[in-house]
């Protein structure tokens, strides 16, 4: 299958333009906010709808700043240190999920300190809605023909425009399905069938474990970033950065089981 060359810009009006990537962020945040408020209405945890509304600004800053700096520092530092002004061009792409995770964790911590609420209670809500953004973000990656997979002879192979014209795994769709749709369903099942919000840190632990496992496995099909390549012969940066998430998620679950 040959993927058509889709314009990454949906439309432009003068200097103003909307890209698929930016649209995925906006829609993801709005849907996440809507879903979080519905969960709060039903289960009435410590976190209120007002808290979520106030946290959105913190979340946006954490995602954008953390995601961009994470990409700059972890994936292409030499390029951006040579041309620092390029760091500000987020509209050209180049965001790190792991960097965004650190950014939103810091934002959540500062928010909880200001409003005197439990940190894990907030992250339990956040992690429940994150798969929505992950799904939309990976679909945008697919449309933009970026972050594609390794060369394959399987029937899943897709020829991406502006590439080497070899059939490759559509790893963006694998991630959208597992890290987005499947993880969303797992967390929704945990919340609505087992009321996991009653145990602070449980949802966060479930999310961290499943996301990191899915990411580590799918990285086996994803082409490593060209400027980094493989680390220690066979590992990718995504796998290495996901390992601490797996350990932290396991710790949160074990911590609850030991009580």
Swiss-Prot record:
UniProt protein name: Phosphatidylglycerol--prolipoprotein diacylglyceryl transferase
Job of this protein: Catalyzes the transfer of the diacylglyceryl group from phosphatidylglycerol to the sulfhydryl group of the N-terminal cysteine of a prolipoprotein, the first step in the formation of mature lipoproteins.
EC number: 2.5.1.145
Superkingdom of the organism of origin: Bacteria
Amino-acid positions noted as binding a 1,2-diacyl-sn-glycero-3-phospho-(1'-sn-glycerol) in the UniProt annotation, renumbered to this chain: 138
First-listed, main subcellular location of the protein, grouped into a coarse class: membrane
Pathway in which this enzyme or protein is active: Protein modification; lipoprotein biosynthesis (diacylglyceryl transfer)
PROSITE patterns assigned to the protein according to its UniProt record, in alphabetical order: LGT
Recorded topology in the membrane: Multi-pass membrane protein
Entry keyword set: Cell inner membrane, Cell membrane, Membrane, Transferase, Transmembrane, Transmembrane helix
One GO biological process term: lipoprotein biosynthetic process
InterPro entries: Lgt
Keyword Magnesium included in the entry's annotation: no
Gene Ontology cellular component terms for the protein in this record: plasma membrane
Compartment(s) where it occurs, according to its Swiss-Prot or TrEMBL record: Cell inner membrane
Pfam families: LGT
Residues that span the membrane, as ranges: 9-29, 55-75, 92-112, 117-137, 172-192, 201-221, 228-248
Species per Swiss-Prot/TrEMBL record: Rickettsia typhi (strain ATCC VR-144 / Wilmington)
Family named by the database record: Belongs to the Lgt family.
MF annotations from Gene Ontology: phosphatidylglycerol-prolipoprotein diacylglyceryl transferase activity
Keyword check for Transferase: yes
């Amino acid at each position: 299958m040959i993927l058509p060359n889709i314009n990454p810009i949906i439309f432009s009006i003068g200097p103003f333009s909307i890209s698929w990537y930016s649209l995925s962020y906006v829609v993801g945040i709005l849907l996440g906010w809507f879903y979080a408020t519905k969960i709060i209405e039903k289960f009435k945890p410590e976190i209120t709808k007002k808290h979520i509304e106030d946290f959105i600004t913190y979340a946006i800053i954490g995602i954008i700043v953390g995601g961009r700096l994470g990409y700059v520092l972890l994936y292409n530092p030499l390029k951006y240190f040579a041309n620092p002004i390029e760091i500000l061009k987020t509209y050209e792409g180049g965001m790190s999920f792991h960097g965004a995770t650190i950014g939103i964790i810091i934002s959540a911590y500062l928010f909880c300190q200001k409003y005197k609420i439990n940190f894990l209670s907030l992250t339990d809500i956040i992690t429940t809605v994150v798969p929505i953004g992950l799904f939309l973000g990976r679909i945008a990656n697919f449309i933009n023909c970026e972050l594609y997979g390794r060369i394959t002879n399987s029937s899943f192979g897709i020829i991406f425009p502006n590439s080497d014209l070899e059939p490759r795994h559509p790893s963006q769709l694998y991630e959208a399905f597992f890290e987005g749709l499947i993880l969303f369903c797992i967390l929704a099942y945990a919340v609505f069938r087992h009321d996991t919000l009653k145990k602070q840190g449980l949802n966060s632990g479930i999310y961290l474990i499943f996301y990191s496992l899915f990411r580590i496995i799918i990285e086996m099909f994803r082409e490593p970033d060209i400027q980094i390549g493989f680390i220690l012969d066979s590992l990718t940066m995504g796998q290495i950065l996901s390992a601490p998430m797996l350990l932290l998620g396991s710790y949160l679950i074990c911590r609850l089981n030991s009580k």
